[in-house]
Amino acid sequence: MFGAEVDVDLRAPVDGETIAAVRAALNEHEVLVVRDQDLSGDDMLALGHAFGELLCNPFSPSADDAPELIIFDNHDENPAALTDVWHADETFRAEPPSVTMLHSLIAPSLGGGTMFASMRAAYELLSERMKAFIEGLTALHDFGRFDGLFPNEPDARARLHQIELAHPHPVHPVVRVHPETGRQVLYVNRHFTRRINELPEDEGAALLEFLLTRPSMPEIQLRVDWRAETLVMWDNRSVQHYACHDYYPQRRRMQRVTVAGDRPVADTPPPPRSVQRVVVPNPPEQPEAASVPRRRVLRPFERTGGEVPVS
């Protein structure tokens, strides 16, 4: 079943048995929703580190003292940018993220939900002939859509060039194999996939556009409606998401960490391990989150002094 709501307390410290159970549930359900999680920034960092190394996103606003902790604080005076598109996170990397964790600090009373689509299901719903046709194809990925975040001035363009050098347009399989479950996944997205390498430009563009529409099928979707202190974790290797920009002028403040992954491959790994359903206790009731003042959070490249983190 795609998506699950689970009861577990993920405030630090979290023991290894709980982490293993959550990881198993994530492999099975792809998206996990955990309500009533009073998580500080340090809690988010600790939880992310329990799953692996954390990445810094050079295009997203982050905490001043922790570039791995992304802060989204959006409202009518600071609308979100480039998130209302179906995408997987950061496939412009040679080794894209494995898991994304997003936690709500302030949630709108209406709207502001996040849509998710299972690209495992998207692949499975293709015809056998289409599966055979796209087998072995590869695609170029880059972050060209984000160039507009950088003003046309020397310092900003120099920072952009620094990021380009760190992430030189990787090639990923159109169909990747999940390294833990062994399931095949359709692995192209509208944010970062530019072209299919093995086809003429016109044929590749037509095929790519068809594949890019697959997340729009309601049969493979779910929607999470946020309320304060909700944590959502998803498998970035097999899930795409879309942030709904339908809540202005209300405010939506979120914190996010992104766990490093491995290089996507098309070869089938050994048979997957069995997955156990998670049974965890209900968390204790948490106090209401304190109000947070409005202050635009800076992206790494907007800060002065020091290099842009590009890990």
Regions picked out by a protein language model, each given a short descriptive name:
Residues M1-L231, N236-S311:
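Non-heme Fe(II) oxygenase catalytic core, chiefly the N-lobe of the double-stranded beta-helix
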